Amino acid sequence: MTTETAEKVEYIIETKDVDLFYGSKQALQKIALNIKKNQVTALIGPSGCGKSTFLRTLNRMNDLIPNVKTTGEIHIGGENVQDPKIDMVNLRKKVGMVFQQANPFPFSIYDNVAYGPRMHGIKDKKVLDEIVERSLRQAALWEEVHDRLDRSAIGMSGGQQQRLCIARVLAVKPDVILMDEPTSALDPISTAKVEDLILELKKDYTIVIVTHNMQQASRISDETAFFLNGRIVEFADTTSIFTNPAEKETEDYISGRFG
């Protein structure tokens, strides 16, 4: 009996038979994926395969797109994400998201990080100061910006802006952080900083990352799901996926035969 089996695996995200349609076009087919707590799970696959669409089902961002229909079961922390009565503000607090392009608000660095806590009712300046410092430290940004918190976030470098967006997510203490190609617009040095940050953050958070960069997936993830044509072809520990894939389609993609 493995240690993992003996200790019983804790899944924070559980999905079953998830289908998604954009109008009449089916984008996801019977997706069943259980994601472990405090791990990094990578979603890989060619463009248009459904990986970003699936990521957005986890905090219902697809609801913002006209004519989208999602069916199946999605539970996060035991809560039914598909429940029509769910508190969407609370869901997106619990399940934060970092996008491909850094999207800082046109505010000061301080106000970017304090925005979420203020939205959730925190007004005390001392408490906000503590949250801002903690979040910027967690995002490995405090030492770079602590003496210019009142300056506009728009003047930061691209890599700093992306880490600021991560700090903004951390400020509301999510359980899960979704990342959609978070380093694709960054230079190699900034990418390395974000990757180091992801590895540090998984001690306290569960991270699901969409990436086209297979080397990145192999460096930072514990498990990897390979998507193709709206379905999951293979889901396994990352080492197995990249060194001994069970499916020929996975092997063909990993080896660069298509995609």
Swiss-Prot record:
EC annotation from Swiss-Prot or TrEMBL: 7.3.2.1
SMART domains the record matches: AAA
Gene3D superfamilies: P-loop containing nucleotide triphosphate hydrolases
Catalytic activity of the protein: phosphate(out) + ATP + H2O = ADP + 2 phosphate(in) + H(+)
Subcellular locations according to the entry: Cell membrane
Enzyme class: translocase
Top-level taxon of origin: Bacteria
One MF annotation (Gene Ontology) recorded for this entry: ATP binding
SUPFAM superfamilies hit by this protein: P-loop containing nucleoside triphosphate hydrolases
GO terms for cellular component: plasma membrane
BP-aspect Gene Ontology terms: phosphate ion transmembrane transport
Residues that, per the record, bind ATP: G45, P46, S47, G48, C49, G50, K51, S52
Family annotation (InterPro entries): AAA+_ATPase (IPR003593), ABC_transporter-like_ATP-bd (IPR003439), ABC_transporter-like_CS (IPR017871), P-loop_NTPase (IPR027417), PstB-like (IPR005670)
Keyword annotations from UniProtKB, A to Z: ATP-binding, Cell membrane, Membrane, Nucleotide-binding, Phosphate transport, Translocase, Transport
Recorded topology in the membrane: Peripheral membrane protein
Residue ranges annotated for the ABC transporter domain, each copy included: 13-254
Annotated family: Belongs to the ABC transporter superfamily. Phosphate importer (TC 3.A.1.7) family.
Subunit structure: The complex is composed of two ATP-binding proteins (PstB), two transmembrane proteins (PstC and PstA) and a solute-binding protein (PstS).
Protein's job: Part of the ABC transporter complex PstSACB involved in phosphate import. Responsible for energy coupling to the transport system.
PANTHER family tied to this protein: ABC TRANSPORTER I FAMILY MEMBER 17
Identification of the protein by name: Phosphate import ATP-binding protein PstB 1
Organism of provenance: Listeria monocytogenes serovar 1/2a (strain ATCC BAA-679 / EGD-e)
